[in-house]
Amino acid sequence: MTAEPATKKIKLELSDPSEPLTQSDVIAFQKEALFRCINRRRVDFEALRKQYELSRRECIDVSRKLANIMALIVTLARFIETFCTDANEKQLCREIAQGDETLIVQRSDSFMKLLTKYGKPNTTDSNTNSNASDHIQELTTELKNLRKSKEELFYENSQLTEEISALKEYYTNIIRKYDRDESFTIKRVFKEDKTDAVKELREDEKESNENNIKSGNKDSSAINGDNTSKKSEKGDELVQAEDERKEDAENEKLELDLKFSDLRAEINSLSSTIKDLENIRRENEEELIKTRSEVSNLKKQQIAAADQDPDFKSYDHESLLAKIQHLTEQNAELSEINSSFLSKFQVLAKEKEIYTKKVREEFQKSLDSLVEMNSSLEKDVVRIRTARDDLLSKIAILEAEKSKTEVLSDLQHAIDILKEQWTKIDQRSNDTKSSSTQDALIKEIQDLEKGFRELSDLTHKKYSEIINHESVISKLTVEKTKADQKYFAAMRSKDSILIEIKTLSKSLSKSNELILQLKDSDRLLQQKIGNLHKQLDLSQNNERRLIDSSKTETLKIIDLNNTSTKLKRSLEKLQEESNKSIADMTHLETKLNDTEIELKHFKQKASHLESKCEKLHDTLFRGNNKNKGSSDEALVEELANFRTLVYCSLCSKNWKNMAIKTCGHVFCENCCKERLAARMRKCPTCNKAFSSNDLLTVHL
């Protein structure tokens, strides 16, 4: 039953079952009774806690589902509001769109009619109409089936709950019985161990008797001295067992006779009481018929008096009550209108806040996105510019290298021309054989060498000058390209800045437009709020007027009630006197009937008890003749111990039914209450303090 581990039972030091009860046995019995009561309370608490957890989870699920359904209904109402043409239908949709549960439940029928009205398709296409009608019929059949299943499930649920409650009671009774069966103190007090031992002895005697009979039948053929002695001993045992059986049978017969006589006496008393009650019922029915006829005659007399006296109708209590009810209904309607206006005002204020928040968030998002785009574009421009500068510098270097290669190619061409001339001169010198010509040629060659050297010096100088000039030109060109690059970069940055300025101006204009729109919406909302305030003032004025009118009406009603009460007092006095006399008569009659029934019951009881006492006297007289008088002292002592166990130790009159939680001692309820009333708030046995909250009812 519980999630806690089973508590270990304390070993109780009980006295021997053959001996009479002691004070320690009584204390152990009381403690174990308290323990059983606390354990039962703990089990009930654990079951309640589990039920509470389950119901809480189910409540959360139901609330979540209900919220989803409410949101769906609100969206449906808002959607249907766009199609509505009638003002009442729009008003209904708006009221349902507010999301008030009580309003939705009240206006559910009208809202369902709206849904069926606007849920139908147009009459243009016949196929769609037929499909829609089929679909609606299917939905209606499904709805009917669902309702049937709901009713069946509800009936099954009720049956299951009844079965669960019955099972719970059954298992709690079983647990209680199991706890009582397991307790050693109950066995010790009510002598269950002795009865068990007696039963075991009887079963052993029966088995031994059967075995003896079988062995006697088997050994009847053998004739020995030892067998005869054994048979004699077994015969004595059989005689004793038969005597005990006879005594048990007589006791059982006596108990059954007593029970039968008790039941017969109860049946007789019940039959007599039933007859008396039937007679009383008949008399009451006759009196009821008479009173009803008298009431109908009185009503007829009142109607006739009202027809004769026209002023009598003005004092009609029912009409005044109807007026009061009508005024209260009007007051309730006005309060509902006032609350609806207040809820609308709150909804509009919430919508305004939500709208402003959304606009601010969108504006902030667009601004952040523009800033991010601007930063990314600036990074891209810087990267492109650096790449462009690198490429332009590479191009300038390549152009400078190209000019140097051209100069070298020109020099190589001049050297080739000089080599050709030199080869031609060598050929000419080989062709000429004369010495004169050779000398002239040598002189010419020397002159040519000088001229060549001078030319080569001049060419070298000019070459160096050209190289210097070209290096200066290349440096100037590089600087010019750099300046051009800087100029173009500045122009491009100017273009990008102009583009950024344009985009920012566009965003600024958009933000200004948004601000203007927000201002317009704010103005409209303020106008709506002002209108709502005016409507509120009007409704409050109407409410005040109605309250004043209701006050005047109530004053009139009070005056009329006073006049009616004055007129009714005389009637009430007469009716009270008649009712008192009737009540006294009926009270005396009921007392007479009760006393007669009790007399009969007591006479039957007395006769039954006399017969019972005679039977018990006879049985006791027979038993005392057989048994000795030594067992009487033990019985008296055991009865005294049982009285100390069951009856209160303070008054020794009432049963013990109230335990003190602080110490565990048990007394009767009257003694505990008397001690608390006399401010004696200490236990009489152990002097421990206790209060009214420490008392616990116990059933021993």
From Swiss-Prot:
InterPro entries, alphabetized: E3_ubiquit_lig_Bre1 (IPR013956), Znf_C2H2_type (IPR013087), Znf_C3HC4_RING-type (IPR018957), Znf_RING (IPR001841), Znf_RING/FYVE/PHD (IPR013083)
Catalysed reaction, written as an equation: S-ubiquitinyl-[E2 ubiquitin-conjugating enzyme]-L-cysteine + [acceptor protein]-L-lysine = [E2 ubiquitin-conjugating enzyme]-L-cysteine + N(6)-ubiquitinyl-[acceptor protein]-L-lysine
GO MF, one example: scaffold protein binding
Comp. bias intervals (Basic and acidic residues): 200-209, 228-250
Compartments, as annotated in UniProt: Nucleus
Alphabetical keyword list: Chromatin regulator, Coiled coil, Metal-binding, Nucleus, Transferase, Ubl conjugation pathway, Zinc, Zinc-finger
EC numbers on record: 2.3.2.27
First-listed, main subcellular location of the protein, grouped into a coarse class: nucleus
Top EC group: transferase
Compositionally skewed regions (Polar residues) per UniProt: 210-227
Coiled coil segments of this chain: 126-406, 555-620
Biological pathway: Protein modification; protein ubiquitination
Region (Disordered): 200-250
Highest taxon of source: Eukaryota
Any single Gene Ontology cellular-component annotation: chromatin
RING-type zinc finger locations on the chain: 648-687
Residues spanning the membrane: none
Gene3D superfamilies for the chain: Zinc/RING finger domain, C3HC4 (zinc finger)
Pfam family, one: BRE1
Biological process terms in GO annotation: double-strand break repair via homologous recombination; meiotic DNA double-strand break formation; mitotic G1 DNA damage checkpoint signaling; mitotic intra-S DNA damage checkpoint signaling; protein ubiquitination; regulation of DNA-templated DNA replication initiation; subtelomeric heterochromatin formation; telomere maintenance via recombination
Family: Belongs to the BRE1 family.
Its biological purpose: E3 ubiquitin-protein ligase that mediates monoubiquitination of histone H2B to form H2BK123ub1 in association with the E2 enzyme RAD6/UBC2. H2BK123ub1 gives a specific tag for epigenetic transcriptional activation, elongation by RNA polymerase II, telomeric silencing, and is also a prerequisite for H3K4me and H3K79me formation. It thereby plays a central role in histone code and gene regulation. Also modulates the formation of double-strand breaks during meiosis.
Subunit and partners: Forms a complex with the E2 enzyme RAD6/UBC2. May interact with LGE1.
Something else known: Present with 2980 molecules/cell in log phase SD medium.
Full protein name: E3 ubiquitin-protein ligase BRE1
Upper classification of the organism: Eukaryota, Fungi, Dikarya, Ascomycota, Saccharomycotina
Gene responsible for this protein: BRE1
